Each structure stands twice: as structure tokens, then as C-alpha cells.
Amino acid sequence: MASGSVAECLQQETTCPVCLQYFVEPMMLDCGHNICCACLARCWGAAETNVSCPQCRETFPQRHMRPNRHLANVTQLVKQLRTERPSGPGGEMGVCEKHREPLKLYCEQDQMPICVVCDRSREHRGHSVLPLEEAVEGFKEQIQNRLDHLRRVKDLKKRRRAQGEQARAELLSLTQMEREKIVWEFEQLYHSLKEHEYRLLARLEELDLAIYNSINGAITQFSCNISHLSGLIAQLEEKQQQPTRELLQDIGDTLSRAERIRIPEPWITPPDLQEKIHIFAQKCLFLTESLKQFTEKMQSDMEKIQELREAQLYSVDVTLDPDTAYPSLILSDNLRQVRYSYLQQDLPDNPERFNLFPCVLGSPCFIAGRHYWEVEVGDKAKWTIGVCEDSVCRKGGVTSAPQNGFWAVSLWYGKEYWALTSPMTALPLRTPLQRVGIFLDYDAGEVSFYNVTERCHTFTFSHATFCGPVRPYFSLSYSGGKSAAPLIICPMSGIDGFSGHVGNHGHSMETSP
């Protein structure tokens, strides 16, 4: 490449597209372009959101930029090379202003071209000096290295941006699918309710017709009777006002006709109509209660799913610590299952091991933050799970209660669920626990338990005071039958459509060997 072309390329790479001058404090944007800090300040003003790149016009939701120190260094080198560029015919450098000798050398300490007299002077004595051409080639190589680095970073940024755009498109596609599902489900629900509405309204129309047909004849008869009575009353009123001779004429017949009129029986609504209306009212009441229960259950289920999902965001990988296991507890090779055996293993009685009760602790330890894991208890008749402080007594008997550093729930005799508070709290569960979720919020002092199968909350220990690291806690004993099955720590990846934990905002200490 000709030197002029190289110079032009260097000039373009180190020039701000806004002020068209050498970069001063270049700042890299998310789109990969570089702009002077002052130029960005003029372009963006006081705006903090929805700012755009002055070069490509890509819009960013928030104001975000990073100093590009590599480009700043390259710019300084290019500016320095321009000031040191050979001048005059033949491409020779100028002369030293002090000694009037050609500038053929370069002092690395002072970063300036010097002449041979300067090289021998006291000012540059002991300095590292290179031929000017060699120094220029070195600088060009440095510039090229930095340009290569910047181009690699730019390409990487472009790939990251493409990955972000792809992720955004995929996530938006998922939300669109969920949106379509919601619209479809509610349309089906709407059509179903509309059909029930039409049926009920049609039944009301039938009732209206039955009422009209049943009562209309009686009403017509009453109307005729009323008309007849009106005529008779008019005759009697007229007779009452007649002179004596006329009044006495046909008086017997007139009074006889009046006496034959009987008082009507009390009105009685046809019983079959009353029964039909009562049945319909019961249907409407059932409809009202059903819709109310449906709405409440839907809201409750949505809240349950949300609460459990929020806990599952903090899922951690829990394993069993064999150094803590009671000798009758058999651990699986992957340290995720534990079962009880009547035959005790010959294990060292190290300080960490429980020696009286069939207990084992999990790893890791937790010293802050939020953490969630799940345990498959199956049909076991007796078990205890939860958390405990790492400092709990391992030797001899100890009551599993908060004052002793334990926060756990337990099943006794296959039917009695208890929260091991002090005193204990009975848990009247509607369905047996098969899979239990444990959520530890260390900083808030809370330990919560969930029925994962039913997606509902079971119990929460509040206002707990943790004195040091906290660990998962497991205890079980043998009762025969199905209860001989192991407790299983469930792998969290992919459970119920959940893929791994999004983020564990806390701290833990690994304790497994």
C-alpha cells in the first residue's frame, strides 16, 4: 500500500465524524462507532434516554458510552507522526532548530526526533535512541496492532449486537405465542359463556310465554266480570235515585241479581310456574357462585404460580455432604439421594457427623441472599426437611426448633404435617406433599416451603435470626413399605418448563469435598 493511502486510512480512523478533527477523548457507543466526548455532549444535550448515534442514527434506550483508550492512543500516535513527517523534496525530515542538523534519530524517552548532535548532548545522554525510520516503522506497527484490536473489538460488538437482536426476536416470539394463547383461551371462554347466556335467556323467554298463557285466561275472565259488575253497579245506582213508584218496580229481580254475585277467591299463582321460576333462580345463583369461584380460583392460581416461579428464579444446585451423614443413611453416588438402612456403616466419627439422629446436611453453605431447591419426598411416612445453621450440635440429642438453629417442616406417621416451630404448628394440608420447594431469604430472615405439585405456599418461618452460615437439612427414618424409598434432591434444570436459575442474588460457601 502506498504511504499516502496508509496516511489517509490512519487519518480516517482517527477523525471524529462529527467535528471532522482528530479524536479528543473518543467514546465508544453500543453500535461500535466512536465520537468525541464533547461532540456527544453537544449532540445529546441533557437527554438521558432515547439518544441516537450521530453517525448511524441507531437509537439507544439509555445514555451509555465507554472511553476508548486504545483509539485515543492511536490518535496521539497519528498526530505525533504527522508532526514528525518528513518534509521537503525527497521525503527528508526537517532540521534541528537548535543545531541545524538533519533530524535522523528518535529519542524514546523524550518521544521526539533529534539530530546526531542532540544524541551526544547531555540532555539526551543515556537515552534510548533509534534511527528515525526504524522508530516510524515501530509506530506504524503499533498503530496497526491497535487498529487490528479495535477492528476485532468492533466485529465482536457487532456479533454481540446480532446475538442480542436474535435473543430479542426469540423472546418477543415467545411472548407473541403466549399472547395468542391467551386470546384464544379467552375467546373459547367467551363463546362458552355466551352460549350459556343464550340458553338461559331462551329459557326465560319460555317462562315468559308459559306465564302469559297460564294467567292470561284468568285475567280475561276477571276483565269480563269487572265489566259485568260495572254495569250492575250502574243499574243499582240508577235504581237508588228513582222515584218511589219506579224504584219498587222489578226491585226484587234487581236485588236478586246483585245477591248472586260472589266474592272471588284469593289469587293463587299457579304452583308449576312458581316452581319453574324457583328452579331458574337456583340456576342463576349457581351461575353467580360458579363465576365467582372461577374468578377467585384463577386469580389465586395465577398468584400461586407467580410466587413459586419467583422463588424458582433463585434455584441452586444442592448436594448431600457425606461427612455429615448419620451412619444409617445411605447416600447415592451423585449425592442427591438418601435412604435409611437398619445396618449402620462403619464411618469415622468425625466432628461434622450426626451420631444420634438420622440426619444429613446439604451443600453449599449460604451466608447471604436468596436460594431455592426442591426435594422429592414421595410416599415416605416420616421425614424432616428445611435448613439449619452450620454450627448446630451434631453429637447427642437436640430438638429441631428455631431456637436451636433449625427451620424445618416434618411429616409424622404418613399423615401429620408439622412446622417445627416452638411450640409446633400443625399444617392442615388438603393434599399430601410429594415435592417440596424450600426458599431461603437469608437477608430477610425467612424460610418458605411450597407444595410444588399444587403450586401453592405451605408455610413460612419469619423473623429468623441466622447466626452464621446456613445449610440444607434432611432427616428421615425407616417405616417399611413405600416409605423405604429415598429422599431425592431434584435437579433444578428444566423443571416444569423452567430452564436453570436466572440469577442467584446471594452468596454461598462450597462445603462438599
Curated annotation (Swiss-Prot):
Its Gene Ontology cellular component terms are: cytoplasm; cytosol; early endosome; endosome; fibrillar center; mitochondrion; nuclear membrane; nucleoplasm
The UniProt record lists the keyword Zinc:
yes
Fill in the domain comment.
Answer: The coiled-coil region mediates interaction with EPC1 and CHD4. The B box and coiled-coil domains mediate interaction with PML. The B box and the distal coiled-coil domains mediate homomultimerisation. The B30.2 domain mediates interaction with EIF3S6.
Q: In which tissues is it expressed?
A: Widely expressed. High expression is detected in testis. Low levels were detected in spleen, thymus, cerebrum and cerebellum.
Question: What gene, per UniProt, encodes this protein?
Answer: Trim27
Per its record, what are the GO molecular function terms? DNA binding; identical protein binding; transcription coactivator activity; ubiquitin protein ligase activity; ubiquitin-protein transferase activity; zinc ion binding
- Keyword tags: Coiled coil, Cytoplasm, DNA-binding, Endosome, Metal-binding, Mitochondrion, Nucleus, Repressor, Transcription, Transcription regulation, Transferase, Transport, Ubl conjugation pathway, Zinc, Zinc-finger
From the broadest rank down, the organism's phylogenetic lineage runs: Eukaryota, Metazoa, Chordata, Craniata, Vertebrata
What metabolic or biological pathway is this protein involved in? Protein modification; protein ubiquitination
Name of the featured protein: Zinc finger protein RFP
**Catalytic function, reaction form:** S-ubiquitinyl-[E2 ubiquitin-conjugating enzyme]-L-cysteine + [acceptor protein]-L-lysine = [E2 ubiquitin-conjugating enzyme]-L-cysteine + N(6)-ubiquitinyl-[acceptor protein]-L-lysine
Return the PROSITE patterns for the record.
B302_SPRY (PS50188), ZF_BBOX (PS50119), ZF_RING_1 (PS00518), ZF_RING_2 (PS50089)
UniProt family annotation? Belongs to the TRIM/RBCC family.
**Positions annotated as zinc finger (B box-type):** 91-132
The answer to keyword Repressor applying to this record is yes
What Pfam family is a match for this entry? zf-B_box
